Design a protein with these regions (language model features):
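HhH-family (HhH-GPD) DNA N-glycosylase catalytic core used in base-excision repair
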Residues: 1-314
Length: 314
């Protein structure tokens, strides 16, 4: 296995340690391996598996990410693809100053901006993965969703070993498209979700659903294209647009967790309705997706603190 090391300097300020903290508690971080201040992830570049191994050094205003790429027959195109992927997933090249300025419009949200000032949205590795995880997360607790995601990976994913650790590659769209939905049901996934996963995987494997093409369209067009697929509703579409395609100004306002925390922070005495959440979120334009990320980070932090206090383990 060949190994190449490169370095990335994010737009400052940036706290990669805080980003790793998010991933440690995220129900969407299934294939990521976080150990101390080190990030490991196996991905595919074309048909070739590679391992992305990231550490960091320096203060938040001068952070450097040290990116090792491990794989067979590495070339310049592969390395460039991986570095672009890292910058995209961690939003490293986006100037956060306009987002931080939202505190002037909304002092309540400004509390979160201050708490998580030096981290930016972390995307799910690719839109297809975001679609799978979001479908499995429909109307279930995050712990249940996490177990289902792991079960799917172990059913039809691909393990590889790196530095003494077992990493897993996401199943390809073709892997899942060729499965009988009943096989997916046997690992504890509902019939409806199993059918949707196979359906979406078939559309992606045949090129009928092209996420690269969707990424270049206007948000409303993407939303309409996704919600035309059976089993994909508004919440799923907006989560995929935000977490998978990286639309900065899309917020999944139907998310119950967001509704609860916004209702609490804004003194409603109850969870916000979807309409109320969208109205409050008008103050966060054109960064509503970034705002949703911080609210989710706050929810994860609160849940983690509660879990530690009660002595629970994942």
């Amino acid at each position: 296995m060949e190994l190449v090391e490169e370095h990335i300097t994010p737009v400052s300020p940036y706290n990669f340690g805080l980003a790793l903290g998010y991933l440690r508690t995220s129900s969407s971080a299934i294939l990521e391996h976080i150990s101390g201040d080190r990030y490991l992830r196996a991905i595919r570049v074309g048909d070739h598996p590679v391992v992305v191994d990231i550490t960091f050094s320096g203060p938040i205003d001068q952070t450097t990410l040290h990116v090792k790429v491990a794989g067979e027959r590495l070339n310049d195109d592969t390395i460039r693809t991986v570095l672009t992927w890292v910058c995209r997933v961690f939003s490293l090249e986006v100037n956060p100053a306009p987002f931080h300025a939202l505190y002037k419009r909304d002092p309540v949200f400004g509390i979160l901006i201050n708490n998580y000032r030096n981290v930016r949205p972390i995307l799910i590795a690719d839109p297809y993965e975001a679609m799978l995880w979001t479908i499995l997360g429909q109307q279930v607790h995050t712990r249940v969703a996490r177990r289902m995601k792991w079960s799917l990976v172990r059913l039809c994913g691909h393990p590889l070993e790196y530095d003494g650790k077992e990493l897993w590659l996401l199943p390809t769209p073709r892997d899942i498209a060729n499965m009988d939905p009943s096989d997916i049901e046997r690992i504890g996934i509902s019939k409806q979700k199993a059918n949707t996963i196979v359906r979406v995987s078939y559309l992606v494997s045949t090129g009928t659903l092209d996420f690269k093409e969707l990424g270049g369209l206007e948000p409303e067009s993407v939303y309409q294209a996704l919600t035309r697929i059976k089993g994909i509703g508004p919440w799923t579409a907006e989560c995929v647009m935000m977490r998978g395609l990286g639309f900065d100004d899309v917020i999944p306002a139907g998310d119950v967790g967001l509704q609860h925390i916004v209702g609490r922070f804004y003194g409603l005495g109850r969870k916000a309705t979807e309409s109320e959440l969208r109205q409050i979120a008008e103050k966060w334009r054109p960064w509503r997706g970034w705002a949703a990320f911080l609210w989710w980070f706050q929810l994860q932090t609160e849940a983690y603190v509660q879990q530690i206090a009660s002595g629970e383990k994942e």
